[in-house]
Amino acid sequence: MTSIFGYPKEELQLDLVAHGFKKYLAEQIFDWIYVKNIYSFDEMTNISKTDRNKLQEYYTIEPLKIVVQQQSKDWTVKFLFQLADGYKIETVLMPQSYGNSVCVTTQVGCNMACTFCASGLLKKTRNLSTAEIVQQVMMVNRYLATTNERVSHIVVMGIGEPFDNFDNTLKFVNIINDPKGYQIGARHITISTCGLVPKIKQFAELKTQVNLAISLHAPNNTIRNQLMPINKAYPVEKLMDAVRYYIELTNRRVTFEYILIENVNDSRETALELAKLIRGLNAYVNLIPYNTVAENGHQRSTKINKFFETLQQQKINCIVRREFGHDIDAACGQLRAKNEGVIRK
């Protein structure tokens, strides 16, 4: 059996027909799951009992298991979920003034080995299925239902590299963006990549309205090679060519994410080099205070404001990202790594 959560509506229609159901059943199922938050075939009362029983022969509809749930002083909520095969993943709910944003995970572990990230301490075991990505949003919506709220924004920035799980990530986007699904607008969805150049170009050619964020963290190959091994395969020059290709095809603005690390990438000279690198692009810089992971040996920069001011003086659009859940291990991979004894508690 396969999970009902893994099907975009058009695929579910085809699969239902192949099993002898009527095509329109797909819209009924989508309405029950994604609009009414019902996760049991038995409760889908406008579907015949015969069809409900038959659906259970072909599809599973079980939720994820919550292993740990932590709430921060700033109302951020971090979930550690257990998958059917026992592996664990993280999801973070970040309440905002404009709605509820959720950071989802796309892989069990990560092979990108960025030196500042807790996710890389646990190597990639496998990709998440589309269903397992969708279920993260489902579980957060279930949590929010107690206060009559819903998820309004998605950032695909959790554990793993989304473009290393390209097809399942894009199917996930299809489902949550569907007018009969979670109805989350494409411009309320952001996918972050560490720089898989061929996939950035492939994503550009889809001409979707989904936002693209680039985990840059350094303006040159010397520093980026030190922080992000992926740069040795796709150096800054090739990455920026892919970004320009994306902007040209989509006319969409790109976000450059930049974690500031003490005495590594936070000097005035580095800020000036960053400004030169992205000047003239339809883009802005998201400066991120570092959530320290002791095992990685890096420290949070003490020069965040000076770096920000330098970029502003250079007429570069930039913001300093608000911190979420600093007191509850809300940085990517921290909670799972602590739960599995990889980093200190």
From Swiss-Prot:
The lineage of its organism: Bacteria, Bacillati, Mycoplasmatota, Mollicutes, Entomoplasmatales. It is an enzyme of class 2 (transferase). S-adenosyl-L-methionine binds at residues 160-161, 192, 215-217, 291. It catalyses: adenosine(2503) in 23S rRNA + 2 reduced [2Fe-2S]-[ferredoxin] + 2 S-adenosyl-L-methionine = 2-methyladenosine(2503) in 23S rRNA + 5'-deoxyadenosine + L-methionine + 2 oxidized [2Fe-2S]-[ferredoxin] + S-adenosyl-L-homocysteine; adenosine(37) in tRNA + 2 reduced [2Fe-2S]-[ferredoxin] + 2 S-adenosyl-L-methionine = 2-methyladenosine(37) in tRNA + 5'-deoxyadenosine + L-methionine + 2 oxidized [2Fe-2S]-[ferredoxin] + S-adenosyl-L-homocysteine. This is Probable dual-specificity RNA methyltransferase RlmN. The keyword Ribosomal protein does not apply. Its cofactor is [4Fe-4S] cluster. Specifically methylates position 2 of adenine 2503 in 23S rRNA and position 2 of adenine 37 in tRNAs. The active site is at residues 90, 332. The gene is rlmN. PANTHER family: 23S RRNA METHYLTRANSFERASE, RADICAL SAM CORE DOMAIN-CONTAINING PROTEIN. It comes from Spiroplasma citri.
